[in-house]
């Protein structure tokens, strides 16, 4: 059974007690969110033993607890649907191994690498969720314990609606595989269906 690490729970409690004021320096919400993530990291770094990420790392910060590595992604959100395009976090959760590739790996290589290394493990990819419309509304979750994932053929491999993912769902490893890989498969089926519909209308442009 997966559960949240103690230190991450303490971070949530700490942030909930703060009077967080998130900067809004840009009309672009994505730019503001990226800047806000840095603000949250700096606040946490000043009070907890967390590791700064390198430029191309696949997490916003990490820490060790009981000799286990915990990667965490900060999400500043209005609790709507976000893309979860992190192949490296998915790989870590499904294999228990640190990825030796970057997020630009081709899908075919990504699938084969997961298949070769897929193994029951206790590792996970964590999310620290902060509601930008109510900064007291903060919670943490993880990829394996999400209540639901949303398949999307336009935003691979899938998405998550944070408002529907407050409660942790504990799964055994067989259930985890079905949950993550099954949703991923649905997304690729949607992508393929779009191509089939295109060819149905424009058969002269079918790729041979």
PLM segments and residue spans:
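Nucleic-acid endonuclease domains
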Residues: 1-59, 65, 70, 76-208
């Amino acid at each position: 059974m997966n559960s949240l690490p103690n230190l991450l729970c303490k971070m949530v409690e700490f942030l909930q007690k703060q009077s967080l004021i998130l900067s809004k320096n840009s009309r672009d919400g994505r730019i503001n969110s990226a800047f806000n993530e840095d603000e949250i990291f700096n606040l946490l770094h000043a009070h907890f033993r967390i590791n700064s990420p390198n430029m191309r790392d696949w997490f916003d910060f990490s820490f060790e607890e009981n000799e286990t590595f915990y990667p965490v992604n900060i999400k500043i959100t209005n609790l709507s649907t976000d893309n979860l395009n992190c192949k490296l976090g998915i790989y870590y959760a499904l294999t228990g191994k640190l990825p030796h590739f970057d997020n630009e790996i081709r899908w075919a290589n990504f699938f084969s690498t997961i298949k070769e290394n897929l193994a029951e493990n206790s590792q996970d990819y964590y999310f620290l969720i902060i509601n930008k419309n109510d900064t007291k509304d903060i919670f943490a979750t993880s990829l394996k314990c999400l209540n639901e994932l949303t398949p999307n053929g336009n935003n691979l491999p899938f998405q998550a609606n944070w408002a529907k993912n407050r409660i942790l769902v504990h799964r055994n490893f067989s259930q985890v595989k079905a949950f993550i890989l099954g949703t991923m498969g649905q997304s690729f089926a949607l992508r393929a269906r779009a191509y089939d519909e295109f060819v149905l209308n424009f058969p002269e442009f079918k790729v041979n």
